[in-house]
């Protein structure tokens, strides 16, 4: 007789999110005719859609995450004093504990920090090397008189490359630039982890350490875009053998230790709807930043944020570095990406941290890049299922500030960005099925013509019409 207790080992078939849902928001389901009218009125720009006309909103993970009960409880403890809010000191302590920087200046969001940083460090004629551009970062650098220079590894520009750290800096490219223009014309090296425009790709700890050593040789600062540094820490834990047994919080602190400061949009990793910061180790630079904050953002103890929002961010930072949280967050992105790969749909690989990036060049090869294939694909996905995604290609790349010509990036992508703790596995299934349906009918799609182009960051407000 078989002993009932003697059973063969069973493989775990699935995983579940490390949270449960307390509050829900109804979603509006629209008809195809309603979506056709909405996207036409929006000029085929998903940024110009009304949120009430969107079923699943994958435009961005910026400020769209769900806060926890712990964060909401903190909102009730908001100290709204104009000066010296206790919530600022809680936020400052949380940043110092988990990121390790000495001096903190709060800002209303990440681009507020980018603006202040650019003003205190960049002068006309400077060069800022970095591991791929980001839209707002590069614009602030250019408005201050600087020129961004891409020194990311070549694999980052290849959507099909399986390099595990496509966010790595090419040390030879960086060295060549320093030798060519001189260290005195490089105010800092701009490092992002993860790299948004490359597909949410991470930079390795070993590579950042090597960049740090090179920068020290020449006396150049490193400034981190820490917006998704927690996600980057997760990839280091998963892909660098020396860190496989270390906690995310430990990895994050070492990662930041190789840099001299950071800009931060707290609307991503820190799990809040608004807010950011500029962190610096150099006290003299901090003094300059603090003086400018009063002009552009508000007093140095609130920086454009309410006390309640600073408290929510302080608590969100604490939650963001929990291993269970980040494992599930990146796991949901991977779930969607793997489903699309299984169906043969072209996406950027390896799967990144915050989003799945559809490769519009391979998805819609019949549409030339100057007819905006990624923009067209994003519009079509909305028409198919009410899913809002974001173009990350020629429209986002903008124009050369000297010649006025379009930049033609190697990567022409549509970003399906997953907000943290918001959507279920069923939403991911529906999204995958909608993408598959568009892919099945891809041959009938034609390009777009831009009929309105704003001066700066055109992807936000540009308007298009069908060719």
Swiss-Prot record:
Enzyme Commission number(s) from the entry: 4.1.99.2
Origin: domain of life: Bacteria
InterPro entries: ArAA_b-elim_lyase/Thr_aldolase, Beta-eliminating_lyase, PyrdxlP-dep_Trfase, PyrdxlP-dep_Trfase_major, PyrdxlP-dep_Trfase_small, Tryptophanase_CS, Tyr_phenol_ly
Keyword hit for Lyase: yes
Keyword Amino-acid biosynthesis among record annotations: no
Top EC class for this record: lyase
GO MF annotation terms: tyrosine phenol-lyase activity
Catalytic activity: L-tyrosine + H2O = phenol + pyruvate + NH4(+)
Keywords recorded for this protein, A-Z: Lyase, Pyridoxal phosphate
Modified residues (N6-(pyridoxal phosphate)lysine): 268
GO biological process: tyrosine metabolic process
Record-annotated disulphide pairs: none
Sequence similarity: Belongs to the beta-eliminating lyase family.
Assembly information from the UniProt record: Homotetramer.
Name of the protein: Tyrosine phenol-lyase
Organism, as annotated: Nostoc punctiforme (strain ATCC 29133 / PCC 73102)
């Amino acid at each position: 007789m078989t002993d009932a207790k003697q059973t063969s080992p069973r493989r775990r078939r699935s995983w579940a999110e490390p949270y449960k849902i307390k509050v829900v928001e109804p979603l509006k389901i629209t008809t195809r005719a309603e979506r056709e009218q909405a996207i036409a009125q929006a000029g085929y720009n998903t940024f110009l859609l009304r949120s009430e006309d969107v079923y699943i909103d994958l435009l961005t993970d910026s400020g769209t995450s769900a806060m926890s009960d712990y964060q909401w409880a903190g909102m009730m403890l908001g100290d709204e004093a104009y000066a010296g809010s206790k919530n600022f000191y809680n936020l400052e302590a949380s940043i110092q504990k988990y990121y390790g920087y000495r001096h903190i200046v709060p800002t209303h969001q990440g681009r507020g920090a980018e603006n202040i940083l650019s003003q205190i460090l960049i002068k006309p004629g400077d060069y800022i090397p970095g591991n791929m551009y980001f839209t707002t970062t590069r614009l602030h650098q250019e408005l201050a008189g600087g020129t961004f220079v891409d020194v990311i590894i070549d694999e980052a520009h290849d959507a099909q490359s399986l390099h595990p750290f496509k966010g790595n800096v090419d040390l030879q490219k960086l060295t060549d630039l320093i030798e060519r223009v001189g260290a005195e014309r490089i105010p800092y090296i701009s490092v992002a982890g993860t790299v948004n425009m490359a597909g949410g790709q991470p930079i390795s700890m070993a590579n950042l350490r090597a960049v740090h050593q090179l920068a020290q040789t020449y006396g150049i600062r490193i400034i981190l875009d820490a917006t998704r540094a927690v996600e980057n820490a997760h990839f280091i834990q998963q892909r660098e053998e020396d860190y496989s047994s270390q906690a995310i919080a430990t990895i994050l602190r070492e990662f930041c230790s190789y840099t001299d400061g950071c800009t931060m949009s707290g609307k991503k990793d820190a799990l809040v709807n608004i807010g950011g910061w500029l962190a610096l180790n150099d006290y003299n630079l901090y003094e300059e930043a603090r003086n400018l904050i009063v002009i552009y953002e508000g007093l140095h103890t609130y920086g454009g944020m309410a006390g309640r929002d600073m408290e929510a961010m302080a608590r969100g930072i604490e939650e963001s570095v929990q291993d269970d949280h980040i494992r599930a967050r990146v796991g949901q992105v991977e779930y969607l990406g793997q489903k699309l790969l299984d169906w043969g749909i072209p996406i950027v690989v390896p799967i990144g941290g915050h989003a799945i990036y559809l490769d519009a060049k391979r998805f819609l090869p019949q549409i030339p890049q100057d007819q905006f294939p990624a923009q067209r694909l994003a519009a079509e996905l909305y028409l198919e299922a009410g899913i809002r995604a974001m173009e990350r290609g020629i429209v986002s790349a903008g124009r050369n500030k000297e010649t006025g010509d379009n930049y033609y990036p190697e990567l022409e992508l549509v970003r399906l960005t997953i907000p943290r703790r918001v959507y279920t596995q069923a939403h991911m299934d529906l999204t995958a099925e909608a993408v598959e349906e568009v892919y099945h009918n891809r041959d009938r799609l034609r390009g777009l013509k831009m009929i309105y182009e704003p001066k700066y960051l055109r992807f936000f407000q540009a308007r298009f019409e069908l060719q």
